[in-house]
Amino acid sequence: MQTWQLPEHIADVLPTNARQLESAREQLLALFRVHGYELVQPPLMEYAHSLLTHIDAGLSLKTILVTDRLSGRQLGIRADITPQVARIDAHLLSANQGINRLCYAGPVLHAQPDGLPNMREPLQAGAEMYGFADIRGDIELIDLMLKSMKIADMGKVLLSLGHIGIFRALSDAAHLDAGQSAALLALMQDKDTGSVEAQVKAWKLDGMWAKAFSLLPRLYGGREVLSDARGRLPDLSAVGGALDELQAVCDAFPDNEIHIDLSELRVDNYHTGLLYAAYAADFHDAVARGGRYDGLGGYFGRARPATGFSFDLRSFIGRLPAVERQPAVLVDAEDAEAAREAVEALREQGQCVVIDYGIGHNVSEELAGRLKKTDGVWQVVKR
């Protein structure tokens, strides 16, 4: 094995792309900040029992576990920042009984690649709101998600909506047990309409519920899906409430192309209600995902309404605007000591100054000039 080789699906980010990522990260955090979202930086590693909440069993498959040499306890390297932020809201920011708006941008590590582009070290960025159950909170986060996609230069973005509350309301009304609900949810996620129909038939569900479950995978399309669903799904208050929330989101974004899919349930297990995602050209999957996950903080002692979104900033590298390196001022090595004061003054002004040792360098070919002493004064002389 070569000493320079990296693990599979792990990659370095070289200067050109690193500049793109850091520029986009700075712009995103600035965007979040002017919308009232405070930056938090959870640790890369925590005790495993804190990272692996019982709510999302699938997270354990993504999480790399190690033994802490100090305590002997099991540690986990985070695979998702959202549970960490829920812990912060529930425990460290518990003095605030009102709304907490929080954001983050940091690396996570996956035990296995999670879809394309097959990277195991995403740079997860996102924003979350805790303490507000109203649909207006979800609309605020969706608006912020769409603005984030503009910074990432995604071009025209399709907003996709779903609501897991509809499926769960039907499951409860049909008296499905946890195992049946999970099995049917998996079939819904696979869009396997035939298997859904066969499964509800095998369970001998009441005709109304069997028809409703078979109908869900067919309820997709534009905004008209909502009126169609109202006329064809059982008249349950929870179903009606979920459709009202979806309608409110559609009304809030009249100029956006919207796709609604009532069987789109590809969510982390902690999501509880409205689901939203952004799709862009040339990407095989959603470029950002979010939704409501009320109660996740209960695992850490304070269950609160919550909604938020996240995305992998590294997956956008091919679309991010180029960020040119600042032209440098060169100073000859033999002049460096004498010119130290002038060099530091330029650097304090934000100017890149590089000592030229005469053997080449990796600075931009477009130099700002060379620092020379003219008439007793150090000046930048253009080439």
UniProtKB/Swiss-Prot annotation:
GO cellular component term, pick one: cytoplasm
Superkingdom of source: Bacteria
Biological function: Required for the first step of histidine biosynthesis. May allow the feedback regulation of ATP phosphoribosyltransferase activity by histidine.
Disulfide bonds: none
Keyword Coiled coil: no
Pfam families tied to this protein: tRNA-synt_His
Protein name: ATP phosphoribosyltransferase regulatory subunit
Pathway annotation from the record: Amino-acid biosynthesis; L-histidine biosynthesis; L-histidine from 5-phospho-alpha-D-ribose 1-diphosphate: step 1/9
GO MF annotation list: histidine-tRNA ligase activity
Localisation: Cytoplasm
Keyword Secreted: no
UniProt-listed GO biological process terms: histidyl-tRNA aminoacylation; L-histidine biosynthetic process
Note in the entry: This function is generally fulfilled by the C-terminal part of HisG, which is missing in some bacteria such as this one.
Assembly description: Heteromultimer composed of HisG and HisZ subunits.
Family: Belongs to the class-II aminoacyl-tRNA synthetase family. HisZ subfamily.
